[in-house]
Amino acid sequence: MPVSDSLSPDLPNDDTSEEWLEVGTIVGAHGLNGEVKVYPDSDFPERFTQPGLRWLVSPTEASTPEEIQLIRGRFVERKGIYVVKLANVNFRDQSEALKGTKLLVRSNDRPTLAEGEYYLSDLIGVTVVDHQTQAVVGSVVSLASAGNDLLEIQLDNTTKTILLPFVSALVPIVDIATKRIEITPPKGLIPE
């Protein structure tokens, strides 16, 4: 059901105060010619394989995202990462220096989703309500990937969280516009 691209409002904004989407993290160098390994935070492979503009920002220092050209990229299935070539990164020491750097796109560069698909950033903070009783259960705090995606819901008035498979049988209504999700939890999942 959900699709990831992490909205990063805490990243520095440029003078137009736009938001950025974090699509991956550079986790190391690959080879001697400046390629980098990118761990994806996006379900859209074109973020890493199609040439075009991307932005880099260091997680350790407050900085403005820097524009960079993505030249090419490929998926390494057995490792679950992308190997990407960036413009003007031609040597291993340059690519090693980028370790930990976040790869970004502009928030207005979101692909259109199919019905029943949602951006993870749109789900975080949404109020969760019991479909039958209309009682507030809590709010979405995260999404865990497993066989099915699992909504992590922080229960109302507590720090306890529960995991609920994000499938239509258990999550019949998702209304992003009103920031409300209705669930039909299995008996015993939510403490009384």
UniProtKB/Swiss-Prot annotation:
It comes from the Bacteria. Transmembrane segments: none annotated. GO terms for molecular function: ribosome binding. It holds the Pfam family PRC_RimM. It is found in: Cytoplasm. Residues 115-189 form the PRC barrel domain. One of its GO terms (biological process) is rRNA processing. The keyword Flavoprotein does not apply. Keywords: Chaperone, Cytoplasm, Ribosome biogenesis, rRNA processing. One of its GO terms (cellular component) is ribosome. The keyword Oxidoreductase does not apply. Its main location: cytoplasm. The PRC barrel domain binds ribosomal protein uS19. Belongs to the RimM family. Binds ribosomal protein uS19. NCBIfam families: 16S_RimM. An accessory protein needed during the final step in the assembly of 30S ribosomal subunit, possibly for assembly of the head region. Essential for efficient processing of 16S rRNA. May be needed both before and after RbfA during the maturation of 16S rRNA. It has affinity for free ribosomal 30S subunits but not for 70S ribosomes. This is Ribosome maturation factor RimM. It comes from Acaryochloris marina (strain MBIC 11017). The lineage of its organism: Bacteria, Bacillati, Cyanobacteriota, Cyanophyceae, Acaryochloridales.
